[in-house]
Amino acid sequence: MKSKLKLHGFNNLTKTLSFNIYDICYAETPEDLQAYVQYIDEEYDAERLTQILTDVVDIIGANILNIARQDYDPQGASVTILISEQPVTPTDSQIEESPGPLPDTILAHLDKSHITVHTYPEIHPVDGIATFRVDIDVSTCGVISPLKALNYLIHQFDSDIVTVDYRVRGFTRDIEGRKHFIDHEINSIQNYLSDDTREAYQMTDVNVYQENLFHTKMLLKDFELENYLFGDATRTLSTEQREQVTERLKHEMLEIFYARNMPR
């Protein structure tokens, strides 16, 4: 086993995991679109998001200092949790490059650290497409990696598209005074995902190793139209309409995945 790095004082590295999760839906009528927004707004209100983030705190081994949460009118919610590190020695499972736990395997230590989540429901004014975006940031200062929370969070939301960024900033010193700008090995965010997640998504990496900057984009491979319909659309669409809606939804997902408008 690789020996642990002996530090001089506190580990001053800041590790930040930022990711955006998109859930896509089609509703046939304006009323159904509004009903979807209301449904998703209630499903992921501030109370539910607080519970999810509290689980994240448990996963990364942190101590909650303060929670601030807010539901917004007409829709949306946000939660911020301040966390602090306890003086413990991390286990190998906390720092090694491997997937974190799934929602049903959750088992409750970071100065200047926080977790935030914001939700953004959105409706296309013409095409009947609604998107629900969740932005989550997990920032830790110390030895614990926020990447351990990634696997759990992807399984907590209906994730059609996921964009993940991970960066390490600052430096810490060993007992001989030498600077270390990262304290763990990593070559891809994908290594922190479980096998079933890697199999379910088309993924692409853009990594800048010399800058300790890692980026992964994920697009769900399997497309089952029934999983994307809401309201009357689940029973009233003709075969031709279903083909048209399928094309619209796939086009919408590709535009979000590639972050650019694409010709139809």
UniProtKB/Swiss-Prot annotation:
Positions of modified residues (Pyruvic acid (Ser)): S113
Record PTM text: Is synthesized initially as an inactive proenzyme. Formation of the active enzyme involves a self-maturation process in which the active site pyruvoyl group is generated from an internal serine residue via an autocatalytic post-translational modification. Two non-identical subunits are generated from the proenzyme in this reaction, and the pyruvate is formed at the N-terminus of the alpha chain, which is derived from the carboxyl end of the proenzyme.
Catalytic site positions: S113 (schiff-base intermediate with substrate), H118 (proton acceptor), C141 (proton donor)
Signal peptide: none
Taxonomic superkingdom: Bacteria
Catalysed conversion reaction: S-adenosyl-L-methionine + H(+) = S-adenosyl 3-(methylsulfanyl)propylamine + CO2
Record GO biological process: spermidine biosynthetic process
Family of this protein: Belongs to the prokaryotic AdoMetDC family. Type 2 subfamily.
Role, per record: Catalyzes the decarboxylation of S-adenosylmethionine to S-adenosylmethioninamine (dcAdoMet), the propylamine donor required for the synthesis of the polyamines spermine and spermidine from the diamine putrescine.
PANTHER family: S-ADENOSYLMETHIONINE DECARBOXYLASE PROENZYME
Entry protein name: S-adenosylmethionine decarboxylase proenzyme
Organism: Pseudomonas aeruginosa (strain UCBPP-PA14)
